[in-house]
Regions:
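ATP-binding N-terminal substructure of ATP-dependent carboxylate-amine bond-forming enzymes
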Residues: 1
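Active-site nucleotide/adenylate-binding loops and adjacent lid/helix of ATP-dependent enzymes
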Residues: 5-82, 87-89, 99-103, 126, ...
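A short, glycine/Asx- and small/polar-enriched loop/turn
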Residues: 38-42, 160-166
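Protein kinase-like catalytic core scaffold
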Residues: 44, 106, 166-169
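Active-site-proximal flexible loops/turns
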Residues: 54, 163, 176, 180
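ATP-dependent carboxylate/phosphate-activation module, predominantly the ATP-grasp catalytic core
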Residues: 85-147, 171-182
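A short glycine-rich, hydrophobically flanked beta-strand micro-motif that places a catalytic Asp/Glu
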Residues: 150-162
Length: 182
């Protein structure tokens, strides 16, 4: 199907598919830039819907109040945004693998945990271990069946303050650390 991957790179589309697969996501609202959230409580984080929109990472802002969001809107280039509840995470982890047969067969050998020593960094170190969480793997497999994706991918998650797991995104490509699998 022409354009399917491009459509699934949209944060609203892929997070809706993730929820259908049984994965949890941070609460969100899709808004026109300048529109205040109707259901979210602060703090929130602003994200572009796709990396091809706006100023991509420069449009990401953590806002602790309505006043901070209004100020952030003055800098944001994207016409439409995904506003998400900002979760003070314990950490992030991801997996790299591949799916074939329109997402019916998924291979994920390793999980990578980012080692964060500072709140304002993604982590300078990573640890790799076998991916053994069967419950999470089943949900990921369902997500890939929903996407019908064939190819290499990286899928990212965040661990919340009470160890809850939130889906963040899929990159439909190899990541920079994929050498660890080979």
């Amino acid at each position: 199907e022409q354009g399917r991957i491009t459509r699934q790179q949209n944060k609203d589309v892929i997070t809706n598919l993730a929820v259908e697969a049984g994965l949890s996501i941070p609460n969100k609202e899709i808004v026109d830039t300048g529109t205040l959230p109707q259901t979210l409580k602060y703090p929130i984080i602003t994200k572009v819907l796709a990396s091809t929109m706006g100023a991509w990472k420069d449009d990401v802002h953590i806002c602790n109040s309505e006043a901070e969001l209004i100020e952030a809107y003055k800098k944001i280039k994207s016409p439409k945004l995904c506003l998400q509840e900002y979760i003070h995470k314990k950490g992030e982890f991801c997996m790299e693998g591949f799916s074939i047969n329109d997402g019916k067969d998924v291979f994920i050998p390793l999980v990578c945990n980012y080692q964060r020593y500072y709140d304002n960094s993604y982590g300078h170190y990573m640890t790799f271990s076998p991916f053994t969480d069967d419950s999470l793997k089943q949900k990921i497999c369902t997500l890939f069946q929903n996407t019908k994706y064939n190819g290499i991918f990286e899928i990212e998650f965040m661990r919340g303050p009470n160890d809850e797991i939130y889906f963040l995104e899929i990159n439909f490509r190899a990541s920079t650390w994929n050498y660890a699998m080979t």
